[in-house]
């Protein structure tokens, strides 16, 4: 090796060593995260299930991450203002979103100023609950088979209550009517409570309710409960059968919630948030809070960030088909 060649090799080695040293001096994103308080953006007002989940989960995640977790309720625009804020936030993990099934339905219901799937990445699924199909006490049917047979006989005379155009209760009602092959009279209400009130009063026939809204009335035998929209029975309603087990395969319907970060958030940061979420979802206080509102935590096998992203993708596709087939429009 001549002198010039030896000099080039030596300089290359020195430059490589310097670069390695500089890279080693730069801490990985996961080593410095979080460097300030984390904001969980909630698209709904305080007091609802999404806000409640954000607060109890955020408190436990704060202890794991060693930084404060701030809950910020950003309402309006059918939850699009909050979602858009996180989509356009700095992708560093310090501003994240908690949302529920509506984030998937909104893709087909609204003209969005962002691309939901391209703008967000999953951190992890949080909790879920099936719906429960209930009816007025005087409905001449006991059990799903009799109820759906009555729907076929009655047709447009069926007064099917729901909690507002585009709500999960509406989507559930549309999917049931579609699977039974009948056209019914869909009656919108401003939320679940007034819908259930009219079921109790006998002014409406059937309603697809959240368990938390109807469980006390079911246990008091004030209304009929035909099935839960799940593969298995609910522990809180052990006497109410599973719609899927009864043969209604399409009626596997979950109200679910998940955490999302802006697209482009470094994988180590997403993983750090996911690890904190996993710890939170094993905390007895968190689990009790969920149970008190009729919710269950997702199991450990469903908690990977990719699973949350896949859930969003699948739900967007599923509800797009129902919304378009039934010409459902968002509430004005």
Kindly label every feature range from the protein language model.
Residues 61, 88-94, 107-194, 243-245, ...:
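Hinge/capping helix and adjacent helix->loop/strand transition within the periplasmic-binding protein
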Residues 1-35, 145, 331-332:
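Short, low-complexity disordered leader/linker segments with a strong preference
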Residues 115-126, 161, 183-187, 205-206, ...:
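Short beta-strand->loop
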Residues 100-101, 137, 211-212, 230, ...:
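Short secondary-structure boundary segments
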Residues 35-37, 267-332:
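An extracytoplasmic/periplasmic, membrane-proximal ligand-sensing/linker region
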Residues 25-118, 157-159, 165, 181-206, ...:
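N-terminal (or domain-start) structured segment
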């Amino acid at each position: 090796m001549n002198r010039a060649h030896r000099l080039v090799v030596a300089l290359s080695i020195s430059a490589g060593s310097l670069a390695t040293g500089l890279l080693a001096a730069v801490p990985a994103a996961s080593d410095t995260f979080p460097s300030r308080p984390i904001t969980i953006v909630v698209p709904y007002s305080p007091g609802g299930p999404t806000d409640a989940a954000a607060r109890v989960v955020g408190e436990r995640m704060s202890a794991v991450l060693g930084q404060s977790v701030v809950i910020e309720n950003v309402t309006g625009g059918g939850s699009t203002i909050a979602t858009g804020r996180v989509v356009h936030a700095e992708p560093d993990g310090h501003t994240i979103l908690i949302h529920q099934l509506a984030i998937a339905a909104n893709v087909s219901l609204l003209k969005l100023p962002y691309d939901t799937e391209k703008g967000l990445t999953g951190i992890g699924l949080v909790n879920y609950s099936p719906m429960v199909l209930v009816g007025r006490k005087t409905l001449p049917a006991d059990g799903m088979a009799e109820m759906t047979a009555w729907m076929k006989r009655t047709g447009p005379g069926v007064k099917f209550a729901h909690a507002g155009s585009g709500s999960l209760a509406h989507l559930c009602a549309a999917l049931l009517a579609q699977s039974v092959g009948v056209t019914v009279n869909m009656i919108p209400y401003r939320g679940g409570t007034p819908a259930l009130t009219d079921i109790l009063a006998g002014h409406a026939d059937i309603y697809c309710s959240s368990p938390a809204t109807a469980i006390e009335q079911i246990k008091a035998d004030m209304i009929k409960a035909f099935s839960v929209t799940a593969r298995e029975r609910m522990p809180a309603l052990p006497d109410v059968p599973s719609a899927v087990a009864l043969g209604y395969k399409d009626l596997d319907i979950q109200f679910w919630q998940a955490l999302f970060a802006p697209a482009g958030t470094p994988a180590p940061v997403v993983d750090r948030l996911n690890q904190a979420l996993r710890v939170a979802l094993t905390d007895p206080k968190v689990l009790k809070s969920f149970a008190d509102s009729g919710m269950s935590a997702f199991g450990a096998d469903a908690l990977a960030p990719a699973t949350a992203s896949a859930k969003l993708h699948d739900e967007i596709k599923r509800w797009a088909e129902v919304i378009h087939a039934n010409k459902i429009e968002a509430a004005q």
